[in-house]
Amino acid sequence: MIFPSAADEGAIAAVRVPSFPAGNRRRRKIENYVFFSVSYRYICRHPKQNLAMALYRLESDRTQIGIDLDTKTRDNNLRHPDYARHAQIMRLVYVQSLLSGQSILQTIPSLADHFPQLDPFNPEHQACVCCIWDAAFDLHRPPHVRIGRTDCAYFFTERAACEYYRNYSGMSSAQLCEVQVLETYDCFTGDMNWLDAIDESTATARDIAAAAVRYWAGEMSADPLPEVLFQGRYRLTPVP
């Protein structure tokens, strides 16, 4: 058995065993995820800092284009009715991987043996698996970073970075938009390449933790793909 470090113990202490409500669960249509997809983010450190650089977004919901939007009211993962339960399951998976040294893919079936209600191969439950990245990263987010990955909008500093996402499920027909920032509540910029470097077929919780530490430190890789986590008011304008 791999004994946990002090940081691991802190992560373990934050996790409680989830309860599973009876009855059918609501099906979640996953349009912006791939099974074990990774997409991770970039930074502005002060909540009132202006975003002077050009920003872009690949928007799959065309009703959101051309109107004033506010992250306080716009739909996001955190407001999804199943998110809290899914994220709790994934924290449990993450901590079990820390304790056992098993990969995430090895850990999920072992948990499914103990929790029959969790079926990692059921499309209805794949959202649980997708939550692993957000759930794991939140366990390592430092206190001074107030913005999380579940209650924000995601912007890029380059058009090419938006095009990178067209290969993701549900994004092939999304509209490339320029972002007009109306008001900034908070923002953070991180390099999602730390996540892309993870081999999802063999990754353990400690591999994810190492990437998370670099991500939240704002450290850039040799070939960075910076992405902005944004909270505030903004408007999207289509780019021809």
Can you name each region flagged by the protein language model?
Residues 3, 20, 33-36, 40-42:
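Aromatic (phenylalanine/tyrosine) cluster motif
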Residues 32-33, 38-39, 50-54, 62-127, ...:
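Conserved NAD+-utilizing ADP-ribose enzyme module
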Residues 16, 25-28, 41, 45:
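Basic polycationic patches enriched in arginine
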